[in-house]
Amino acid sequence: LSLPSRLFTSLAKPKTKVGEYKGVDVLLCATHDTASAVEGMNVEEGEPYLSSGTWSLLGLKVPSPITDEKSMEGNWSNEGGVGYTRYQKNIMGMWLINRLKEELAPSITFTEFNALTESSSFTGYVDAEDSSFLSPESMKDAFDHKLNREGLKAEDYFRSAVISLSKSYGKSIRELEENTKRRFNRLYIVGGGANNELLNRLTEKETG
């Protein structure tokens, strides 16, 4: 872009003090918003985290990058943290739920959405990581196709999406355990998805 170098400061690590403002130290953040969210979590050493937003990030703080073939094949990445590496995976998140709500019940609140979802006894689910759910013209139609059925009630689609996400999280935790040779007893969840009680309960069940 031919930008002059004077526009840029020197490279520095996260948490480096760069100045003060009205007596308050100004520090560099942890590279970006999600990294900063992870840094702000009270995560015990050796326990995984899940940033549950439109897209979900599930991972673990590790001392150094993990770059074996399993990690590459499973789309696990290594990103900078504050004195550690975030070994994590970008997976489907509330995008499924938000798109279905927007399409099937745009006027209801999320409190009403959660109540509707709880009222359904539907047990069908899809592979939340399937590429057909990334940007479908109709999320409902995408679910119909993968579930191989039509005519479900709105609450059934909602519950199916929640079940599907929990199973995706469970699968990713098992991959993380295998890749790091560890067994986890706790999962820390932050973000909007942390407010979905049914999703939390099903995630607890799927992750053991």
Predicted regions and their residues:
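Gly/Ser/Thr-rich active-site cleft segment
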Residues: 1-24, 28-32
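Active-site core segments that coordinate phosphate-bearing ligands/cofactors
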Residues: 22-187, 195-208
